[in-house]
């Protein structure tokens, strides 16, 4: 489950509950693996990456508060110092959102003292191939690289938040860059997208004579897609790639396009509201741009 602030913690809690009531401790292994992975989704300020979600929390700011129950439970069961450290971090950064009073009343074992902290990772580069996502953390710098997502890159540094880098081309109405693949190669992260844009020719006389294009479905609509029946010509192709390289917490994005010439391109840098940009020119008649 890719929803980091809603459904992932719900699934963890459900598995823990079933494991306890049905005496099936093997179910906890999936919870452990999820909690270990989620450690690498946490920004320095305690917020969690939501860009990869397919649910309502996508691109929303969220804390780790809903994970508190799961991390505390497994920290106590396993004596896991990293899980205990993350519990204490949640207590510092997301205390107002923790809603675990009922759990402490029904499960007195949660009242036991947590194990001693073990260091949480603050310097890493992790590629999660199933999620087509890479996470890089260098101290106070935190970056996310994503395929299958209109946000291809996001970055945090202290209180500054570049919440999304996106780019699009004016290519047959389908030019919003959403990478098909994420390739990790020699310290670089390469996102790729391949597009085709055909021109559709009129139906042939034989196709019209058969009348297939005018057959109606029971609901009164055309039963066939006439565009799919039309011959294509002058098929245009556009290959787009973004290579992200990192050195000591500094990132370079190289965007390249090959194929159809003279295609307009727009690149968007979406910063979190509230900061102040310098060295830029405002876009006339466009708010916050």
Describe each region flagged by the PLM.
Residues 1-28:
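Aromatic-lined, polymer-binding surfaces characteristic
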């Amino acid at each position: 489950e890719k929803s980091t602030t809603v459904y992932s913690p719900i699934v963890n809690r459900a598995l823990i509950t079933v494991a306890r009531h049905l005496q099936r401790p093997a179910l906890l292994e999936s919870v452990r693996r999820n909690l270990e992975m989620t450690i690498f989704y946490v920004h320095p300020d305690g917020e969690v990456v939501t860009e990869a979600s397919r649910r309502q929390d996508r691109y929303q700011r969220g804390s780790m508060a809903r994970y508190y129950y799961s991390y505390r439970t497994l920290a106590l069961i396993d004596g896991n110092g990293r899980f205990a450290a993350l519990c204490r971090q949640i207590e510092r950064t997301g205390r107002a959102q923790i809603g675990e009073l009922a759990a402490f009343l029904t499960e007195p074992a949660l009242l036991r003292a947590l194990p001693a902290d073990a260091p949480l990772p603050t310097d890493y580069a992790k590629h999660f191939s199933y999620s087509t996502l890479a996470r890089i953390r260098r101290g106070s710098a935190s970056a996310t690289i994503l395929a299958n997502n209109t946000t291809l890159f996001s970055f945090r540094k202290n209180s500054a938040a570049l919440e999304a880098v996106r780019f699009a081309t004016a290519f047959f109405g389908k030019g919003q860059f959403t990478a098909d693949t994420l390739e990790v190669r020699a310290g670089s992260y390469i996102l790729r997208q391949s597009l085709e844009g055909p021109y559709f020719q009129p139906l042939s006389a034989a196709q019209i004579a058969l009348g297939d294009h005018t057959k109606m479905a029971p609901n009164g609509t055309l039963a066939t897609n006439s565009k799919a029946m039309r011959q294509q010509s002058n098929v245009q192709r556009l290959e787009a790639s973004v290579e992200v390289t990192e050195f000591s917490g500094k990132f370079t994005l190289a965007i390249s396009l090959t194929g159809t010439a003279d295609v307009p391109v727009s690149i968007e840098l979406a910063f979190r509201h509230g900061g102040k940009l310098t060295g830029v020119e405002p876009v006339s008649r466009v708010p916050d741009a």
